[in-house]
């Protein structure tokens, strides 16, 4: 809330304070499955659906921040060595919780671990590598590609389905293909400096945002 108040003070804009408690989160779970037309990310989906439904009561178009972390390297797997070197999709390293939802015989028949490894190798082989890159630079380029190819698509689909279900048009400016194409080839040392992620993005808004907002640590959601 202090950051919101600072923003209001700086820009004198009109904002509504929306809050989602556990009960509201729970009530929106089944509607979130309907909105996505398949099982999803439980509370992550239901909280987004809840807020979209509230926003749509007064506004029919909204700007969102989807894709900034995927493009500018905001996730830990871009800069934490142990995650960077881990085999497999960094956002889905353990299939055990998924298998626990299935009967043992069904889990064995599906072989989710094998399928995941196959898809990872297949996708990794298609990453557009740069001649002369190696080591961590090459690994980050591969992870960046995997983020755009898989993780980002999941978030865009989730936002589109959830917002449309709520009669809200959500626009995603960071997903502009011109931004993605340009930033994908920007050297890592320009995206991450002095232990701070998304440095390039922060620098781009350094003359627009107050320092306390510009350098605020990312807050997990929900």
Language-model regions, residue ranges each:
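Conserved cytochrome P450 K-helix E-x-x-R motif and the immediately C-terminal K′/meander segment
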Residues: 156, 208-209
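PAPS-dependent sulfotransferase catalytic core
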Residues: 209-222
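Short Ser/Thr-interspersed hydrophobic loop/turn segments at strand-loop and sheet-helix junctions
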Residues: 147-161, 183
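ATP-dependent adenylate-handling active sites, centered on carboxylate activation for C-N bond formation
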Residues: 1-132, 138-140, 161-208
């Amino acid at each position: 809330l202090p950051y919101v108040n600072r923003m209001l003070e700086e820009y004198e804009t009109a904002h509504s304070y929306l809050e989602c408690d556990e009960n509201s989160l729970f009530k929106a779970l089944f509607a979130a499955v309907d909105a996505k037309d398949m099982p999803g990310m439980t509370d992550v989906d239901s909280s987004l659906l809840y807020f979209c439904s509230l926003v749509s009561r007064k506004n029919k178009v909204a700007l969102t921040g989807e894709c900034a972390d995927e493009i500018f390297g905001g996730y830990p797997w871009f800069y934490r060595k142990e995650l960077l070197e881990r085999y497999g999709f960094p956002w889905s390293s353990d299939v055990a919780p998924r298998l626990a939802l299935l009967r043992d015989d069904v889990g064995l028949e599906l072989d989710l671990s094998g399928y995941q490894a196959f898809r990872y190798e297949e996708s990794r082989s298609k990453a557009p590598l740069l001649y002369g890159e190696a080591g961590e630079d090459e690994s980050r380029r591969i992870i960046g590609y995997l983020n755009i190819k898989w993780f980002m698509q999941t978030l865009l689909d989730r936002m589109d389905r959830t917002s449309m279900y709520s009669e809200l048009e959500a626009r995603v400016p960071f997903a502009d293909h011109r931004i993605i194409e340009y930033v994908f080839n920007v050297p890592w040392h320009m995206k991450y400096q002095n232990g701070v992620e998304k440095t390039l993005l922060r620098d781009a808004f350094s003359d627009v945002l107050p320092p306390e907002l510009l350098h605020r640590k990312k807050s997990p959601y929900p």
